[in-house]
Regions:
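Short loop/turn segments immediately following the C-termini of beta-strands
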Residues: 68-70, 128, 192-196, 204, ...
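Beta-propeller blade signature
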Residues: 76-86, 140-153, 202, 376-392
């Protein structure tokens, strides 16, 4: 059924407009029964208006959606909905189960922001271990990497980051997985430390991690002022969005990265990141400036369509999605805003690609409303939208007549 629904969507999608797949006034869960739901609300363990969807990942017939514990009252952090669900506002189902998401259980998941699925059908997530982030922030667990087998819904590995991987200011909200589909043990995850200004690398084969530092990981003080949804605020978030190219001739990939509070895109070879023994001071010039994206082009996440080499970016100051064809130099002309909507794309948080149906999905959640006020449960606050990549590609390439 979900295949037919997606095919039908592709047929009717016009231009490069994003169509709403699901939307929510507030997030509800697939509780065992109404009595349990009512009890959790009465006790304050479930406060509907404090549950804000943030991370999105598409895999087969599921969308994985995270609910970070920004405030108290979040009953499950890692969840999914079925693409077979034809309701307007599907209830979220805890993944892999309720127990793993119960904050009172030993070893449970606390607060994963974004997840990634690799070519070996594994779901990766970095758990910050912090609850009530916007209130009385409390460290419940150390920072850990969770890896799930999506074929069995079992936890494959939990790895705790070392003290040397972090600073006193560290916070991890995004990552990208680099894996050889022909050798699943040859896998690395690159994790951006937005407030400690670094990248942590974890090797699956070595079961070890190390930290990379560079000046390019810092925020740009000229681009930390935001005006979104009527709220003015300042952020000092550094390196955040990460996207990977396809393999180059030497077998390695290019990692593109940018600060949340910044408009410059940078890059580095994964060969540099994967070598834990290199002297970082002598490798300064192995990092490169790709170019500037233009005014108000800040955004958390990015993702490369490996079929076309086009990098897609969330644009929080423009309520939109932009793109850049990585085969040409990056500048304000080659950085193209392909979608903008002041209702369905307000603060686009995460993006995901379904390679089977060639779709780009976006989850938007109007984060400033949670930070500085409260969501109105009588209005649509969260949107999962989608566009056919075939309709986006011409718009992304039409400006790009130059070649590298």
């Amino acid at each position: 059924m979900w295949c037919l629904l997606l095919v039908a969507f592709i047929v009717v999608a016009n231009g490069h407009d994003f169509k709403t797949i699901y939307s929510w006034n507030y997030v509800d869960f697939d509780f065992p029964n109404e009595s349990i739901r009512d009890s959790l609300i009465s006790s304050g363990h479930y406060i509907p208006e404090n549950n804000m969807p943030l991370g999105l990942q598409s895999w087969n017939d599921k969308f994985f959606i995270t609910i970070p514990r920004w405030k108290n009252g979040v009953v499950s952090n890692l969840n999914y909905i079925s693409k077979n669900d034809q309701s307007q506002s599907p209830k979220l189902i805890p993944y892999p189960n309720w127990e793993t998401n119960c904050i009172d259980f030993p070893g449970s998941i606390v607060s994963i922001f974004r997840t990634k699925v690799d070519a070996c059908d594994r779901l990766w997530g970095v758990d910050t271990g912090v609850t009530d982030i916007l209130g009385n922030a409390t460290v419940v667990q150390p920072v850990r990497i969770f890896v799930f087998d999506l074929k069995t819904d079992k936890v494959l590995r939990v790895y705790t980051l070392k003290d040397s991987d972090q600073t006193s200011n560290s916070f991890f909200a995004d990552a990208v997985v680099d894996v050889d589909p022909n050798n699943c043990d040859n896998a690395h995850i690159y994790i951006s430390d937005l407030s400690g200004y670094g990248i942590v690398v974890y090797s699956w084969a070595k079961n070890d991690s190390w930290r990379i530092t560079h000046n390019y990981f810092h925020f740009d003080p000229l681009h930390g002022d935001y005006n979104i949804s009527g709220y003015n605020f300042q952020w000092t978030d550094g390196v955040f969005g990460l996207s990977l190219s396809t393999p180059r001739n030497d077998g390695y990939k290019t990692l593109y990265f940018h600060a949340m509070s910044g408009i410059t895109e940078f890059s580095v070879s994964t060969e540099v990141l994967q070598d834990a023994t290199l002297k970082r001071s002598s490798d300064y010039h192995t990092f490169h400036v790709e170019g500037k994206k233009g005014a108000r082009s800040q955004g958390p996440t990015s993702l490369i369509d490996t079929k076309t080499g086009i990098d897609y970016f969330t644009q929080v100051s423009k309520n939109g999605i932009a793109c850049w064809d990585t085969s040409v130099p990056l500048d304000e002309d080659s950085f193209v805003l392909v979608a903008q909507d002041n209702t369905t794309l307000v603060f686009p948080q995460d993006i995901s690609i379904d390679p089977l149906f060639n779709m780009l999905y976006v989850l938007s959640d109007n984060l400033p409303q949670l930070m500085f006020s409260n969501y109105d449960p009588k209005t649509r606050n969260f949107f999962l939208t989608a566009a056919d990549l075939d309709s986006l590609t011409p718009a992304c390439k039409k400006q790009n007549s130059k070649s590298r």
